Amino acid sequence: MQTYGNPNPTYGWWAGNAGTTNRSGKFLAAHIAHTGLMAFWAGSFTLFELSRYDPSVPMGHQPLVALPHLATLGIGVGDGGVITDTYPIVVTAVLHLVLSMVYAAGGLMHSLLFNGDIGEMGVKWARKFDFKWDDPDKLTFILGHHLFLLGLGNVQFVEWAKYYGLYDNAEGVVRTVVPNLNIGMVWNAQFNFLAINSLEDVMGGHAFLALFMMSGGLWHIVTKQAGEYTTFKGKGILSAEAQLSWALAGVGWMALVAAFWCASNTTIYPDTFFGEVLDLKFSISPYWVDTANLPEGTYTSRAWLTNIHYYLGFFYIQGHLWHALRALGFDFKRVSNAIGNADSATITLN
């Protein structure tokens, strides 16, 4: 974290990231525990939604988020997008709950039992992942593993679609999908991705994304910093604060893209599960409203999912700017001090 030259900074209880700044083992523990929280939410909320699901009301007109996403994967639904078998849904939920306990145990072990620094652990291969925030070689090595695993996730998604199928909103059935591997399609879609209306194109995009991510991951794993470590590559600003700012920028950008996609695209977000497409309105800030006739005080899943993605993305970007400026050395306390001293300031005209 930015210390502005103070060798012994202190942080408030709310600055949780500060406790993991120079302790790679604690940083890993926080990541594992966070994964456990996400898995617990996914499993528990799926069971909660399943207990409240009303088959007489369209899924998209109910306050659901987990069930619609499972339904798009063809889990538990049949023709017409109706839930026909709750067993695979329950299995998915329970699996997430079991994994959340495993992650929680891992987080606690790394936080309480294992060494606070990975470099001091007794396992040789684990020490390879020890890092310092200003060490580009170690950071690019770890980045490579992240990219490679994300690529494997894309491969898994493509293979699921090929062998188990996805829900096709145009046909109203769950069907297998063979990816369209035309690179021209992928290139053109980046300029008009909101209009994609083919599951084959969607899976083709994920297949190419898997290739790019895994190739980039291998590059970062087997190579060190190419060329001299210059300011352009982060020398002087490569820090925990800078890394946090870039992470917030990435998450914020993905949230904004998801908001626009969810608002208008019925291939990826079928109206059977998420409700009708939305209208974009403007007030103090942009917002989306339902086009369906719904009872007073009720909204489609698409409406609140779109709006919450947009506003979370907006504030993530603000967080990115805040931490990026701090990483560059800007001290926001100077702003508050300047405002506080405005009354006593004097202005001279020469």
Curated annotation (Swiss-Prot):
The chain crosses the membrane at residues 27-47, 89-109, 141-161, 202-222, 244-264, 305-325. GO terms for biological process: photosynthetic electron transport chain. Induction: By iron starvation. InterPro entries: PS_antenna-like (IPR000932), PS_II_antenna-like_sf (IPR036001). It is found in: Cellular thylakoid membrane. The antenna complex consists of divinyl chlorophylls (a and b) and divinyl chlorophyll a/b binding proteins. Under iron-starvation forms a complex with PSI, consisting of a PSI trimer surrounded by a ring composed of 18 PcbB subunits. The lineage of its organism: Bacteria, Bacillati, Cyanobacteriota, Cyanophyceae, Synechococcales. GO terms for cellular component: photosystem I; plasma membrane-derived thylakoid membrane. Its cofactor is divinyl chlorophyll a; divinyl chlorophyll b. It comes from Prochlorococcus marinus (strain MIT 9313). The antenna complex functions as a light receptor, it captures and delivers excitation energy to photosystems I. The Prochlorales pcb genes are not related to higher plant LHCs. It comes from the Bacteria. This is Divinyl chlorophyll a/b light-harvesting protein PcbB. The keyword Membrane applies. Pfam families: PSII (PF00421). Belongs to the PsbB/PsbC family. IsiA/Pcb subfamily. Its main location: membrane. GO terms for molecular function: chlorophyll binding. SUPFAM superfamilies: Photosystem II antenna protein-like (SSF161077). Keywords: Chlorophyll, Chromophore, Membrane, Photosynthesis, Photosystem I, Thylakoid, Transmembrane, Transmembrane helix. NCBIfam families: PS_antenn_a_b. It is a multi-pass membrane protein.
